[in-house]
Amino acid sequence: MKTKPEDNMEFHTYRGYELLRQEKFHLSPSMEDYLEMIYRTCKKQGYIRVTNLAQLLNVQASSATKTVQKLTEMGLLAYEKYGIIQLTEEGKKIGDFLLKRHQIVETFLKNIGVKDNILRQTEMIEHHLTAGTVKNIDILNKFFEKYPEIHKLFFEFQKH
């Protein structure tokens, strides 16, 4: 039996492609945090400066500059020394994925009753999840939203 070219191809969902793209760039958790913050800020004002980025992430400007330069070399940012930082199209796609992942994990933690250090816990968890796990967490979040009576039962069960 002859195989068609597509028989040897590996297909993925949108999120799967996003994860592959992320792996292609070999982004460290720290680089993901930078890209996510740049994306958040650029969504609002179109650009960000290194000093502002450093303040938002509570790091030294020199550290922010080094990471911005690496992300620029990877083709995710457009940046010239002492200038503004903007996202390339590829940077926007990955930034959007990273922000959505963050929001999904944060919502999940709230849905299971976490009240303390939600931001810190989200940051600690989000970098270690596969795209499939994020998708399943998102489905659970939507399930709780669609069926609030079940969510209420979960909280009742949690008390025992």
State the predicted function of each range.
Residues 18, 22-59:
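N-terminal helix-turn-helix DNA-binding core of bacterial DNA-binding proteins
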Residues 5-7, 124-160:
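C-terminal regulatory/oligomerization modules of transcriptional regulators
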Residues 21-23, 57, 89-94, 106-107:
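A ubiquitous short alpha-helical element
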